[in-house]
Design a protein with these regions (language model features):
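A structural signal for well-ordered alpha-helical segments within the folded catalytic domains
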Residues: 5, 68-72, 118, 125-132, ...
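A long, amphipathic alpha-helix that forms part
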Residues: 71-78, 105-147
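Active-site rim elements
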Residues: 57-64, 117-121, 161, 180-191, ...
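Histidine-centered active-site microenvironments of extracellular/periplasmic hydrolases
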Residues: 2-6, 98-101, 112, 129, ...
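Beta-strand elements within well-structured catalytic alpha/beta cores of enzymes
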Residues: 85-91, 120, 124-127, 131, ...
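Loop/turn elements at helix/coil->beta-strand transitions in domains of secreted/extracellular proteins
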Residues: 5-8, 81-88, 143-149, 170-171, ...
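C-terminal cap/loop subdomain of S1 sulfatases and analogous C-terminal strand-loop tails that border
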Residues: 8-9, 13-21, 27, 157-159, ...
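Formylglycine-dependent
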Residues: 1-85, 92-101, 121, 261-263, ...
Length: 336
């Protein structure tokens, strides 16, 4: 919808694909294989990468580092849109290990580098370098003061996205725009990713079509300083397991199908570390809190087990590790 109000849009994304484009002459490196049937070697994303730019295969060399190319493409896009509003979406391929194992080095260690022998710390530090380049690109284009920058992550640490605990959806979320966003530093306010869409719509001036339901709440009043509060609670689910969190209380791992229908209940207090939460799962005094949190869960989506297709998929969990549901309905084909 941002295009309808004059915005140009750009996506710079690193995909992990098993196949190079049909008819291509890619002669770069390949990673290993993922651990699933009929897996093939994956074209490299880091050193000597396979990069598709506007539908065309780029020619790369052993000295080319994929993340540098992706960031450079976005900086070039910024230069070409100094006089036009734009929305740029940049899902980095950092921080990820290689298909089949191994972590790449970065240009900090010299070029050409290696697709093995690096460290997660090195990749995180290189994210900082790339973000700095993007901010310098905005500054050079005279757009730093009025460009809203959102920095976040798709999920928590390795493996946690497959569990309905706080560790899955808990990620950094930083919003910056010197000429518009009120500087607050770290805050205890809650938000969830469904809030991003209405936030971008409001900032861009785009309108939501009549009858279009939104789950998220715009962050604009909070980000601009019109209010100091945003959300009372957030919720998340993976397959049949759910969680809900307020500032103080956390009910997680509620899974009546494959786990514990009661879940785990914590008093988080003012703590920021999970190790400092107080487990009150079996406390009679906590029953009113539990009831309130369970009501929130019941008013939010999860797989509709009365649907035969959904039930059959759930019953196959012991052989199929990844399941995809949208609004309680099984997504039979996943494009990414």
């Amino acid at each position: 919808y941002s295009k309808n109000v004059g915005f140009d849009e750009q996506c710079v994304r690193a995909l992990t694909l098993q196949d190079v484009p049909e008819g291509s002459t890619f002669t770069g490196k390949f990673e290993g294989k993922y651990n699933f049937p009929d897996a093939k070697p994956v074209p490299a994303r880091y050193w000597h990468p396979c990069v598709i730019r506007n539908g065309e295969l780029m020619e790369t060399t052993a000295e080319d580092f994929g993340p540098d190319l992706y960031a450079g493409f976005l900086i070039d896009f910024i230069k070409r849109h100094e006089d036009q509003p734009f929305l740029a979406y940049y899902p980095m391929n950092l921080v990820h290990d290689m298909a089949g194992g191994g972590i790449p080095t970065t240009p900090v260690n010299g070029t050409p580098g290696s697709n093995k022998g690096g460290s997660l710390q090195g990749l995180v530090e290189y994210i900082d370098i790339l973000v700095g380049r993007l901010m310098d690109g905005l500054e050079a284009a005279g757009l730093r003061e009025n460009t809203i920058v959102i920095f976040t992550c798709d999920n928590g640490e390795n493996g946690k996205k497959m569990h309905a605990s706080e560790d899955g959806p808990r990620v950094p979320f930083i919003v910056n725009c010197p000429g518009l966003i009120q500087q607050r530093g770290a805050t205890d306010e809650l938000m969830e990713f469904s809030d991003i869409y209405p936030t971008l719509m409001e900032f861009s001036g785009a309108s939501v079509p009549d009858g279009y339901a939104l789950d998220g709440q715009s962050l604009v009043p909070f980000l601009t300083g019109a209010t100091d509060i945003h959300r009372e609670w957030i919720t998340s689910y993976i397959a049949t397991a759910r969680m809900v969190r307020t500032k103080r209380w956390l009910l997680e791992a509620v899974d009546p199908v494959y786990g514990d229908s009661e879940g785990r209940l914590f008093d988080c207090g003012d703590a920021h570390l999970r190790s400092d939460y107080k487990d009150i799962t079996g406390s009679p005094e906590a029953l009113p809190i539990r009831k309130k949190l369970e009501e929130l869960l019941e008013n939010n989506p999860w797989p509709d087990l009365s649907d035969p297709d959904v039930a059959a998929e759930v019953n196959s969990y012991d052989t199929m590790p990844y399941k995809h549901f949208v609004n309680g309905q099984l997504v039979k084909e996943q494009n990414d």
